[in-house]
């Protein structure tokens, strides 16, 4: 068992503490406790009930009590708590005097079992005693003829405390004649002596008053003083003399009390009172005066009480012989006490390493200690040992010193600390042993990198996430400790879509939490591959990497986008054609839409939201096909408005609507003839729009008529050069003014009702589609039969005033569409489809004239919708077959059959050259009007 530290400071608040020993049968061991002195009555010493293996209430039931040995009862039992407590204040100095070890022994009797248990309580010293001189005033006499250097013996102070709390030094008040010299005796005691520094003159100063102060080594330092009165005497020639001047004697510690140890003898050659000697102890300690007795006349020393080797191995005394003339002589007396084996060995740690690095080499010294046994001979011979299962060994050094060394490599991650039990045993009979515990911590070395629990991670984040949102957390474990286990996280540098990954995701270096630095868009970014690095803070740092796959989950954040039919830029609705002869299920058009989302967020369904004629049309739920639900009747209006809704399957669903205008007619002339009779539901906004259109058409018509008049004047001046143009102008002059429509009116008509017609040779049904009108002033022409005639003549006046020639422009490939780019075909067609829309007033005039002529022919009933030479039948190359490709321009879908001429007004193509082809005859529509 290990005793607690024995150092106590004076004046501190001392808390009782207990050293719990091992409870065993009488004769095989004792219960040991330790406590500081001067505790209050009832202070806790130890849990005697626990050490006896009893409950507190069993103390009274079993008759447990303290058996005294005739001494004053110092301790008592508390029956309620089962504790051993003090019966009163215990003064160590009163109990054990100057003994270094103060132990109180008593027995505990358990009456019902008739068992006796030995108990030892060690009383630990505190600095509670001041150094004290025996007398408050000391009178010293000195001859006036004393030479410089004469020493006068002074009484030494006694300090009842032991160890560091005992006496340490002396101080003398300042004076001219004396100084203080402190002599250390062989027993370690400090003896003050007064040394004469200057000769004395009794006639000048008879008495010298000095103050001697004794100081101890406690904290705080305690002191005691005595007043020294030095009286100067007349000369005394001879001082007493001891022969020999030092005495020694050895006695066993168990000698009887009263045994005479030795006799001292001193001589003085003086006579009379100056030769009469008296013996006394100089600076006698209280322990000396209590242990030994000195006969003042004979100089005989005997024992007053028994000796204890463990309390004091030797006693050092100084005996003074003084004559009547105040001269003295002193002799040293050493009493050595012989040992009896009654002390267990002790371990004294000289040097201890509390922490050792785990990478230390085998043979590293951990501790240096010495062993000591208060006994002597075989009783003091000691053997040391430690447990064999530890990676340590003992190696003996000089004297009783030992080294504790490592025997193999240490691993902190396996064992972080050790508690090494050191056992020392003497060779006495019976042998005594002591155990001491040496704690040792293994300091960490950065030999383990951070470790991720998984080889890779994956996580997901929903798109449109807020910036700064936490998306994932990674944690790496480092089995090291301290800074070597402090892990920081970072992302490997990389780029994605031209931007660094650090602009997409950041990571908290301390927690490993990843944050989104931007709002992700599933349509732009679907996944990110990241590498997370975990680094410790060791030197050098170790690190490891783990991959993290970040997936962006789609949200329904995109409304369906309608690709076909496309809306015109002027705000009007697209127009589709349905013949009145169409049967139920006839495909009118197909609404094509896409959704940028994915999964069910992109699943689209179509429904008819509103119709001007309910029950006439139906929309395919999944195909978007607009079909007739019943046969068309004569009473059905020419213009039918359908509102088609396209909705996805997201949560919540998003939708888009599209208005389709269906023109019900078998022939294009029917459409032209019935334009004025189309009735639409009255809408306040439509009324305003109609008013604006009427005003615009009237204004444009006026401008157009003025232009025609100016043009006719110019043409009359060139009558001989433009017979064909003059004939065409004569036909236009015969048309009633009401048949003319302004340029903007024609353009609006074409944009609203531009269509494609698919005719088959074996069917009278025609499929007319009104695709999105396009906004450039170009019209594609195509050769659809063997004969062709120019549709438009362009003229240019050169410097030599040559005649204007009709030319056929080469194909314009600037906006040509290949066959693969077109939504679908329903008839034969040529691959070289070129043409341009008219973009000046003259071309517009000519186009208007031909449209009116075609309308007249259609009204005449002599030409079919397909048209031949000299008619303006509009043939379409596209039927109601569609693809998902968004076609932005449908101008090439309208052409004028029967002519291979290209409408053009490009400045660079009016060079007056003869056309390369197209020299067929052209019928004048004016003749048909006459018929």
Curated annotation (Swiss-Prot):
Keyword terms: Calcium, Cell adhesion, Cell membrane, Glycoprotein, Membrane, Repeat, Signal, Transmembrane, Transmembrane helix
Gene Ontology CC terms: plasma membrane
Membrane topology value: Single-pass type I membrane protein
Region annotation (Disordered) ranges: 800-840, 901-931
Keyword set includes Membrane: yes
Feature: compositional bias, Polar residues: 809-840
Localization annotation: Cell membrane
Ranges annotated as spanning the membrane: 693-713
Segments forming a coiled coil: none
Extracellular side stretches: 30-692
Signal peptide: 1-29
A single BP term in Gene Ontology: homophilic cell adhesion via plasma membrane adhesion molecules
Primary localization: membrane
Chain positions carrying an annotated carbohydrate: 419, 545
DNA-binding listed as a keyword: no
GO MF term set: calcium ion binding
Cytoplasmic face of the membrane: 714-931
Domain Cadherin, first and last residues per copy: 30-133, 134-242, 243-347, 348-452, 453-562, 570-683
Bias type Basic residues, positions: 921-931
Pfam family, one: Cadherin_2
PANTHER family in alphabetical order: CADHERIN-87A (PTHR24028), PROTOCADHERIN GAMMA-A5 (PTHR24028:SF105)
Protein role: Potential calcium-dependent cell-adhesion protein. May be involved in the establishment and maintenance of specific neuronal connections in the brain.
Protein name per Swiss-Prot or TrEMBL: Protocadherin gamma-A5
Species this protein is from: Homo sapiens
Organismal lineage: Eukaryota, Metazoa, Chordata, Craniata, Vertebrata
């Amino acid at each position: 068992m290990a005793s607690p530290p024995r150092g106590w400071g004076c004046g501190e608040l001392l808390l009782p503490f207990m050293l719990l020993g091992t409870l065993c049968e009488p004769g095989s061991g004792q219960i040991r406790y330790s406590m500081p002195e001067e505790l209050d009555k009832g202070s806790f010493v130890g849990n005697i009930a626990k050490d006896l293996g009893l409950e507190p209430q069993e103390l009274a039931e079993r008759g447990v009590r303290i058996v005294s040995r005739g001494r004053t009862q110092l301790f008592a039992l508390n029956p309620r708590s089962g504790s051993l407590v003090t019966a009163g204040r215990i003064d160590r100095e009163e109990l054990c005097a100057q003994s270094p070890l103060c132990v109180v022994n008593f027995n505990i009797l358990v009456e019902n079992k008739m068992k006796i248990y030995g108990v030892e309580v060690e009383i630990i010293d505190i600095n509670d005693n001041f150094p004290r001189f025996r007398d408050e005033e000391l009178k010293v006499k000195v001859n006036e003829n004393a030479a410089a250097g004469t020493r006068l013996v002074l009484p030494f102070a006694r300090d009842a405390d032991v160890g560091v709390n005992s006496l340490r030094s002396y101080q003398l008040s300042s004076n001219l004649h004396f100084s203080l010299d402190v002599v250390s005796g062989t027993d370690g005691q400090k003896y003050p002596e007064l040394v004469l520094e200057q000769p004395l003159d009794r006639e000048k100063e008879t008495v010298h008053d000095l103050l001697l102060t004794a100081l101890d080594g406690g904290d705080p330092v305690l002191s005691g003083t005595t007043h020294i009165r030095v009286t100067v005497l007349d000369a005394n020639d001879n001082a007493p003399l001891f022969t020999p001047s030092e005495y020694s004697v050895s006695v066993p510690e168990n000698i009887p009390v009263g045994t005479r140890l030795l006799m001292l003898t001193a001589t003085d050659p003086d006579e009379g009172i100056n030769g009469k000697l008296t013996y006394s102890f100089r600076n006698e300690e209280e322990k000396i005066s209590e242990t030994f007795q000195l006969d003042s006349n004979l100089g005989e020393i005997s024992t007053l009480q028994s000796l204890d080797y463990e309390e004091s191995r030797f006693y050092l005394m100084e005996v003074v012989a003084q004559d009547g003339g105040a001269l003295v002589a002193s002799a040293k007396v050493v009493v050595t006490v012989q040992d009896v084996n009654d002390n267990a060995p002790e371990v004294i740690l000289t040097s201890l390493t509390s922490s050792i690095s785990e990478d230390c080499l085998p043979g590293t010294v951990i501790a240096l200690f010495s062993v000591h046994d208060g006994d002597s001979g075989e009783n003091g011979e000691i053997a040391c040992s430690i447990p064999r299962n530890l990676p340590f060994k003992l190696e003996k050094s000089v004297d009783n010193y030992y080294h504790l060394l490592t025997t193999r490599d240490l691993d902190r991650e396996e064992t972080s600390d050790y508690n090494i039990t050191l056992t020392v045993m003497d060779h006495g009979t019976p042998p005594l042993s002591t155990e001491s515990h040496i704690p040792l911590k293994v300091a960490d070395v950065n030999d383990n990198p951070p470790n991720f629990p998984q080889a890779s991670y994956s996580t997901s984040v929903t798109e449109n996430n807020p910036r700064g949102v936490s998306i994932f957390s990674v944690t790496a474990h480092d089995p090291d400790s301290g800074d070597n286990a402090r892990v920081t996280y970072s992302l490997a540098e990389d780029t994605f879509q031209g931007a660094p990954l650090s602009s997409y995701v950041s990571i908290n270096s301390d927690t490993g939490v990843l944050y989104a630095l931007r709002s992700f868009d599933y349509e732009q970014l679907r996944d990110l591959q990241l590498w997370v690095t975990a680094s410790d803070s060791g030197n050098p740092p170790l690190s490891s990497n783990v991959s993290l796959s970040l997936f962006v989950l789609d949200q329904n954040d995109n409304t369906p986008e309608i690709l076909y039919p496309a809306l015109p830029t002027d705000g009007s609705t697209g127009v589709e054609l349905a013949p009145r002869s169409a049967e139920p299920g006839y495909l009118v058009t197909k609404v094509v839409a896409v959704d940028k989302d994915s999964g069910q967020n992109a699943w689209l369904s179509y429904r008819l939201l509103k119709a001007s004629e309910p029950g006439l049309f139906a929309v395919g739920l999944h195909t978007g096909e607009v079909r007739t639900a019943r046969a068309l009747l004569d009473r059905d209006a020419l213009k039918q408005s359908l509102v088609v809704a396209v909705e996805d399957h997201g949560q919540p669903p998003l939708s888009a609507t599209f208005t389709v205008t269906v023109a019900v007619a078998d022939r294009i002339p029917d459409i032209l003839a019935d334009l004025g009779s189309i009735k639409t539901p009255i809408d306040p906004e439509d009324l305003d729009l109609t008013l604006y259109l009427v005003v615009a058409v009237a204004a444009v018509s006026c401008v157009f008529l003025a232009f025609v008049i100016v043009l006719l004047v110019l043409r009359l001046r060139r009558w001989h050069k433009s017979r064909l143009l003059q004939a065409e102008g004569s036909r236009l002059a015969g048309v009633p003014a009401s048949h003319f429509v302004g340029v903007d009116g024609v353009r609006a008509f074409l944009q609203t009702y531009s269509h494609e017609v698919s005719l088959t040779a074996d069917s009278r049904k025609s499929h007319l589609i009104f695709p999105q009108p396009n906004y450039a002033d170009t019209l594609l022409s195509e050769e659809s039969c063997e004969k062709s005639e120019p549709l438009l003549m362009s003229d240019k006046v050169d410097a030599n005033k040559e005649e204007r020639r009709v030319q056929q422009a080469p194909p314009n490939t600037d906006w040509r569409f290949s066959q693969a780019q077109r939504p679908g075909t329903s008839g034969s067609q040529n691959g070289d489809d070129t043409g341009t829309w008219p973009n000046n007033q003259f071309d517009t005039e000519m186009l208007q004239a031909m449209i009116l002529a075609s309308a007249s022919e259609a009204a005449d009933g002599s030409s079919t919708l397909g048209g031949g030479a000299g008619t303006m039948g509009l043939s379409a190359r596209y039927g109601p077959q569609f693809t998902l490709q968004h076609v932005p321009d449908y101008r090439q879908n309208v052409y004028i059959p029967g002519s291979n001429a290209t409408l053009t007004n490009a400045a660079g193509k009016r060079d007056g050259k003869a056309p390369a082809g197209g020299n067929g005859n052209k019928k004048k529509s004016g003749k048909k009007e006459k018929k």
